[in-house]
């Protein structure tokens, strides 16, 4: 056991450095490089670009994303909130800096696995950015606002069997999907299960996951000791599916009892290791559990892997289906089918007719929840050098320009000579367009593969220091990653050079004559915006500009978070940047290609004007979780003063921002713990409460600190 743990000590990554926008753009001009010096940053008060330079110092830019607050960190990565400057939508950006080829392969494997998984109960990867100059790989992940299931259980003590059954069914449904796509997670634990704002579960952090090959066994020591089965702790060869089932049993035990079957003595060593290796544990005497849930836990936590319950046995268990009409995977498949049917009914008859003409009938079922599919395909400009020759799924261009393509997106090209927009499917003929604002008048030919998925150009990065790979947990990753095992995925490909598919004579005319007209009008500044702005404002048929009709939604400028959002770091909903055409400082998207270039400074100015600085935000109203120790009849001002006195007496450093306290303390092992205390109103009652949120640090030490604070407050 000790020898296995010591094998992690040979990998130590450097601290991840943050690069400002001015630094990332230094290769473009000498002006931007000179602005990075300390002397240039200290400009005089009368300097006209002072507001922009101040904004650059506050927020860092990575590709098309403004980096905000850190919401998680580990030994090899850190997770930040990132705001897309084009859409205003927020994501969780996982930043890693590999030093060795092995570490880079592990990140490649994680990206490759996330590319093939498309499920509501699995965290989604939207994009991946590789920064060649600083050696960073950034994963743009879905932002889950509810936090970890561990914190959810700590706030409630334990879950009822009904609520635990709901989460367990969702976890089981996501795991069935992973195993059906030959992926084992190998690091299932409460910290890697996230709860969204709707109370649904999502599996995250696939850093230890691997591809299952029939007949091959795995031998890597990975995962957390409390959740790892005996075969991993004894360094035996094992089957990845059986490892996940053991971890599911430990998670279910923790949900319904509020504690783990085994405890850690110093955060690493398991107390009672001999009992763990034999699969022996006891249920707490003060918790009353049904015989069905005990039987299910006893079937999953079995020392012998071959005697452990299978997924088919678990999904048909009496306790799992109690109160439900269908099994978990059947219920999910029905929900997805109903959702797709509802979306098809909402489409206009003309759009349905167009889809039937351009797509074969077999493609209507391409969103099957059990079949993997590629999410994105890359079109690389100028270079096809892969990040690592052993992986076909991650391609890093030598120059920093890229075109990222999203599946199932049609390009609408509006021609001034024809009022009716021509809907062209990219999977039929190559579409050629010119973007002088992004690629300096370089022509790009984008053609899609002969796959059943229609693909279109989506984004062209204006940043010369970043290159993007096809999208394929926003949580901290600890320890050494297991050696990657690559598997060729036929569903994930690259865009070929030529495509000879054709439809009919009328459609061929669109691709031949319309293409020349398109280039002709583009150089006369008469053509309309293409898929870049069509994808951003898809509800508009004519995407010539952004009008003031779009709903004004404010996005923060202080590192991706303003004072209003700061009260709720993880409860952030997707929003759009309001670019008002009537505002003199806001950028406008025009049909002219020369006006399509807009800078970060314009976006930041528009955000700053709309952010409403200095206004005291309203206190949030929440349903819970609350108990008698975290609720009070005191008004918010009195409660804030009471919390400040308590934090000062306990020597916990903090910084208050309206109703939120950013706290920092040290655990007994001298590890820093960052967490939040938010004052909020209890929904439907005339009383107020406090809510704790862990940002980084040891989970158990954080739980002990919260208990001490609640006890000392004496609300």
From Swiss-Prot:
The KA1 domain, residue ranges: 666-715
Compositionally biased intervals (Basic residues): 517-527
SUPFAM superfamilies: KA1-like, Protein kinase-like (PK-like)
A single BP term in Gene Ontology: protein phosphorylation
Protein family membership: Belongs to the protein kinase superfamily. CAMK Ser/Thr protein kinase family. SNF1 subfamily.
Domain Protein kinase: 65-320
Protein's name according to its UniProt entry: Probable serine/threonine-protein kinase MARK-B
Membrane-spanning segments: none
Comp. bias intervals (Low complexity): 24-37, 345-368, 451-478, 487-513
UniProt biased composition (Polar residues): 381-399
SMART domains documented for this protein: S_TKc
